Amino acid sequence: MPQKKHNRVRSAKVLRKTSETDISVEVDLDGSGSSTVDSGVTFLDHMLTNFSKHSGIDIALRCKGDTGIDDHHSVEDIAIVMGSAILEALGDKKGIHRYGWAIIPMDEALARCSLDLGGRSYCVFHAPFSRAEINGFSTEMVEHFFVSLSRTLQANLHLRVLEGSNTHHKIEALFKAFAYAMKQAVHIIGTDIPSTKGMI
């Protein structure tokens, strides 16, 4: 799907520093899918690199977090900042497709994502995982990542694993489905606000 030519700059950089994390996220919605990701959580780096590659959104992300405790604060705060950065880069959302969906396989796993960038924050997530963690990444944080991101992105997000047994494959399929849904949703197809309300 070639990106519609436009003269807008759809990029943003957001910083967040708390007693638990120090995060910088920079995104370019009209990028080439290049990324530099250092989250402090290796498996999350892998997922976010995949998201960047398959969404076409350039990402530069750095996080220094209290991973000596666990990964919760880093994963949650990265999602918060990523959502904020993408929302800022979207600007007034004129001409965007707004909606996106994808069903993506990863070997035996199959995941579906549907999203709406219409300004209404809601996340529905269904994905059972047989493993509690992968290389220091708590699998319960997958849902929390998407819930946190949907809030600051102001997006309605539905994610579901339809098939699968391997936890790694199921999570990767979810992130790739999200990537392709996002690629479609941010794609510019016109010049109007995609809502009868006149704003989103």
Curated annotation (Swiss-Prot):
SUPFAM superfamilies with a match to the protein in the record: Ribosomal protein S5 domain 2-like
Disulphide-bridged cysteine pairs: none
Keywords for this protein: Amino-acid biosynthesis, Cytoplasm, Histidine biosynthesis, Lyase
Main location group: cytoplasm
Pfam families referenced in this protein's UniProt entry, alphabetically: IGPD
Any GO BP: L-histidine biosynthetic process
Protein name: Imidazoleglycerol-phosphate dehydratase
Species this protein is from: Chlorobium phaeobacteroides (strain BS1)
